[in-house]
Amino acid sequence: MSRRNAAEKRPILPDPQFNSRLATMMVVRLMQHGKKSTAQRILSDAFGLINERTGGDPLELFETAVKNATPLVEVRARRVGGATYQVPMEVRQERGTAMALRWLVSFSRARNGRSMAQKLAGELMDAANEAGNAVRKREETHKMAEANKAFAHYRY
């Protein structure tokens, strides 16, 4: 690994269809084998289904879903004197959003049958209503951090 200089962080451009940076991030995480147009179609179809079912703005629901699935704390392994402790640490905003999107996509893929757009729409609507596996994963992460609060002084 190079010790010279860290890679420059590229700005995330807003999605051309929805004019949202969050939508661009979601497309990138939905994409498989470099098929960006397919990922964009999946997100667009999912938003269409959300609009059909709720009648509200799908972009607002999407943002709410991501906010509800975003963890605030997580545990990280830290070795101290031969023992490994699960140390609770706060999650930076960018990392939290990335984790939420990753969970939303993975739990959408794990859902049964139907098209990916339908599975994604279902997971997003569940997350917006504080239900669904992505929100459950967030609660689980918070519980782990709470249980290991005693090791918080090992923070680095």
From Swiss-Prot:
InterPro entries from the UniProt entry: Ribosomal_uS7 (IPR000235), Ribosomal_uS7_bac/org-type (IPR005717), Ribosomal_uS7_CS (IPR020606), Ribosomal_uS7_dom (IPR023798), Ribosomal_uS7_dom_sf (IPR036823)
Q: Which domain of life is it from?
A: Bacteria
GO MF annotations, alphabetized? rRNA binding; structural constituent of ribosome; tRNA binding
One biological process term in Gene Ontology = translation
**UniProt keyword annotation of Protein biosynthesis present:** no
A single GO cellular-component term from the record reads: small ribosomal subunit
Kindly indicate whether the keyword Acyltransferase belongs to this entry: no
Enumerate the UniProt keywords alphabetically.
Ribonucleoprotein, Ribosomal protein, RNA-binding, rRNA-binding, tRNA-binding
Q: What is the recorded function of this protein according to its Swiss-Prot or TrEMBL entry? A: One of the primary rRNA binding proteins, it binds directly to 16S rRNA where it nucleates assembly of the head domain of the 30S subunit. Is located at the subunit interface close to the decoding center, probably blocks exit of the E-site tRNA.
Q: What HAMAP family does the database record attribute to this sequence?
A: Ribosomal_uS7_B
What is the name of the protein in this document? Small ribosomal subunit protein uS7
